[in-house]
A protein has these predicted regions:
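ATP-dependent adenylation/nucleotidyltransferase module used to activate substrates
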Residues: 1-149
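A short, aromatic/hydrophobic, helix- or strand-capping loop or linear motif
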Residues: 151-154
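Conserved small/polar residues in nucleotide/adenosyl-binding loops
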Residues: 156-161
Length: 166
């Protein structure tokens, strides 16, 4: 059976790594590239804020080339759509027929992707789709994959009103 030429949409996060691992374990898909979006000014991924240099190191370690789609810092959905359409066209010329994602349950995101990609001849694949977060985490840990926290998000700039130290 000929494997389906596929691009994996890479965020650099644990769910993305787990979905990629599952897709690579399958004889169904030939992963020809990891695709990520990055802020043109900061050179960080738009999804998790991971430095592009780290994403490149991840791709090198995985053994699949990274394709970075540059996005304007203040660009909206129209800019994103245009940039992704160009990227899809590039991969369609190489015979890619499937885009693989690591989503679990975001129906609106999946619907958007399917609506955008189907007219371009790309089928959406979601190896983790419909599984509970607990099940995905358990499978991730059992897979032998490991994760390292490389970015965090500051949610509060002042002590919480519940902070016992204040």
């Amino acid at each position: 059976m000929e494997r389906k030429k596929s691009v994996f949409n890479w965020s650099g996060g644990k769910d993305s790594a787990h979905a990629l691992w599952r897709a690579m374990q399958s004889d169904e898909y030939e992963i020809v590239a990891l695709l990520t979006t990055a802020n043109r000014s900061t050179r960080r991924s738009t999804m998790h804020g991971i430095p592009e240099s780290l994403l490149l190191a991840q791709a090198e370690r995985i053994g699949v080339p990274l394709h970075v789609v540059d996005l304007a810092p203040q660009g909206g959905m129209e800019d994103y759509g245009e940039a992704m359409t160009r990227a899809v066209g590039h991969f369609r010329q190489q015979g890619v027929t499937h885009f693989i994602f690591g989503d679990i349950f975001l129906h609106d995101v999946r619907s958007y992707r399917e609506a955008q990609l189907a007219p371009l001849g790309i089928e959406v694949v979601e190896p983790l789709w419909g599984r509970s977060s607990a099940e995905v985490m358990r499978d991730f840990l059992e897979s032998g994959l490991r994760t390292v926290v490389v970015t965090t998000c500051l949610l509060y700039t002042s002590p919480s009103p519940r902070d016992p130290k204040t």
